[in-house]
C-alpha cells in the first residue's frame, strides 16, 4: 500500500493498492458512510444502446465484498458525485479495487484510525509457508496477514511396514513431495519454509528442500496435515520467521480467550454489548472481531463504534477475515471477543 496524499482538513487520504494483502486491508478499513472516489466504468444509455464509459465517481459506501486471498474488492455504494450529464447521483454503483488501483477515501470522523490501518500496508508483509508431514498425510499452507491459505494437501499412501518396497517407496514419495513444495514456493517467490511433523520424515523432506536452496526451519509436531500446521502456529514454530502476522496473533489471542472462558476467571468476554461495556471501562486489552460483523447491516455501526473506542483506549484490535481459521473459531461467540486487563462487573 502506498499512501500518496493526505488532506487532514478535508478528511481525505489517497492510496495506491500494490498487492492482494492491500486489498484485504482496505476491506477491513472501509466503513459504511465513508466516501470513496476513483476512476471506474459505468454503463450509460447512448444513441446505440448502453455502453460502458470510463469516469471518476464518488460513492457513499454501503458495504464491500471480498473473498479471502483474492485480489479484487467490490466497494458498493450510492453515487454522490460524478459527471452531471449522465444523471448518476443517487444511483447504486460498485467500484472495483485491485493491485495498481488508486482511490481516495474521505472520512469525516476517525481519519487518524484509518491512516493507522492503511499504513500497515506500507510495512513489509511476510508470508510464511508451513509444511506439516507425517507417514499418513501432509499439508502445505501459507500463513499471511489475512489468514491461512491452504495450498494443497494429501496422503503419502506408503506400503505397509512389512513390505520390502516400503523404503524405496518412501524415498520416492519424499522426493515427489519436496519437488511439489519447491515448485509452489518458487511460483510465489518464497525462499523459506517451516517444516513440522513427528519422527524423521520431516527431517528428510526438510533436507531435500534445503538442497534446493530454501531456508528451512524444522520443528516437531504430533501430526501432519492441517492439524500439524495449526499445532505449529499454536506452539510458536513460526516465531522468529514472522513476528507480526495478524493471523497468528488472532489464533494466539483466541487460544488465550478460550482458556480464560474455561477457567471462568473474568478475563474474557464476548458479544458486542459486553465488549462495549468493557471498552467503556478501559478494561479491554485485546479485541478480536470479524470483518463481516463490521460490515453487518444490523450490528455494523455499533461494531465500528466498538473498534474505534477500543483503539482510542489503547487496546490492540485484530480484525479477522471471513472464511479463515480464526473466523471459524470466532463465530460461536458472536463474531467478537475481548481479553481484559482486569475483570469487570456486568
Swiss-Prot record:
GO terms, molecular function: endonuclease activity; metal ion binding
GO biological process: nonfunctional rRNA decay; nuclear-transcribed mRNA catabolic process, no-go decay; nuclear-transcribed mRNA catabolic process, non-stop decay; ribosome disassembly; RNA surveillance
SMART domains xref list: eRF1_1
InterPro entries xref list: eFR1_2_sf, eRF1_1_Pelota, eRF1_3, Pelota/DOM34_N, Pelota_arc, Ribosomal_eL30-like_sf, Transl-rel_pelota
Cofactor or coenzyme needed: a divalent metal cation
SUPFAM superfamilies hit by this protein: Dom34/Pelota N-terminal domain-like (SSF159065), L30e-like (SSF55315), Translational machinery components (SSF53137)
Keyword Cytoplasm attributed: yes
Its EC number(s): 3.1.-.-
Entry's family note: Belongs to the eukaryotic release factor 1 family. Pelota subfamily.
Domain remark text: The N-terminal domain has the RNA-binding Sm fold. It harbors the endoribonuclease activity.
Subunit note: Monomer.
Name used for this protein in its record: Protein pelota homolog
Organism: Ignicoccus hospitalis (strain KIN4/I / DSM 18386 / JCM 14125)
Amino acid at each position: 500500500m502506498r499512501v500518496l496524499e493526505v488532506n487532514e482538513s478535508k478528511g481525505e487520504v489517497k492510496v495506491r493498492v500494490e498487492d492482494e494483502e492491500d486489498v484485504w486491508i482496505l476491506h477491513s478499513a472501509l466503513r459504511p458512510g465513508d466516501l470513496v472516489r476513483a476512476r471506474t466504468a459505468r454503463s450509460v444509455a447512448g444513441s446505440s444502446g448502453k455502453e460502458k464509459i470510463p469516469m471518476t465517481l464518488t460513492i457513499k459506501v454501503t458495504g464491500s465484498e471480498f473473498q479471502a486471498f483474492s485480489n479484487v474488492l467490490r466497494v458498493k455504494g450510492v453515487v454522490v458525485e460524478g459527471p452531471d450529464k449522465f444523471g448518476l447521483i443517487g444511483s447504486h454503483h460498485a467500484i472495483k479495487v485491485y493491485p495498481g488501483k488508486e482511490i481516495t477515501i474521505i472520512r469525516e470522523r476517525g481519519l487518524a484510525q484509518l491512516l493507522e490501518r492503511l499504513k500497515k500496508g506500507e510495512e513489509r508483509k511476510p508470508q510464511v509457508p508451513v509444511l506439516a508431514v507425517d507417514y499418513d498425510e501432509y499439508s502445505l499452507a501459507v500463513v499471511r496477514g489475512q489468514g491461512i491459505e491452504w495450498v494443497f494437501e494429501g496422503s503419502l499412501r506408503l506400503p505397509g511396514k512389512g513390505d520390502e518396497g516400503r523404503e524405496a517407496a518412501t524415498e520416492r514419495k519424499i522426493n515427489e513431495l519436496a519437488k511439489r513444495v519447491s515448485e509452489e514456493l518458487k511460483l510465489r517467490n518464497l525462499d523459506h519454509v517451516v517444516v513440522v511433523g513427528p519422527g524423521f520424515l520431516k527431517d528428510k523432506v526438510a533436507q531435500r528442500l534445503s538442497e534446493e536452496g530454501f531456508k528451512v526451519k524444522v520443528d516437531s509436531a504430533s501430526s501432519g496435515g492441517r492439524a500439524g500446521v495449526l499445532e505449529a502456529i499454536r506452539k510458536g514454530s513460526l516465531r522468529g520467521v514472522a513476528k507480526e502476522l495478524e493471523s497468528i496473533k488472532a489464533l494466539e489471542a483466541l487460544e488465550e480467550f478460550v482458556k480464560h472462558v474455561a477457567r471462568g476467571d473474568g478475563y474474557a468476554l464476548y458479544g458486542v454489548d459486553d465488549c462495549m461495556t468493557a471498552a467503556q471501562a478501559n478494561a479491554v486489552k485485546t479485541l478480536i472481531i470479524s470483518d463481516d460483523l463490521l460490515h453487518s447491516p444490523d450490528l455494523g455501526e455499533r461494531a465500528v463504534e466498538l473498534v474505534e473506542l477500543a483503539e482510542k483506549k489503547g487496546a490492540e484490535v485484530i480484525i479477522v477475515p471471513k472464511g479463515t481459521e480464526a473466523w471459524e473459531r470466532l463465530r460461536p461467540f458472536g463474531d467478537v471477543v475481548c481479553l481484559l486487563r482486569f475483570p469487570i462487573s456486568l
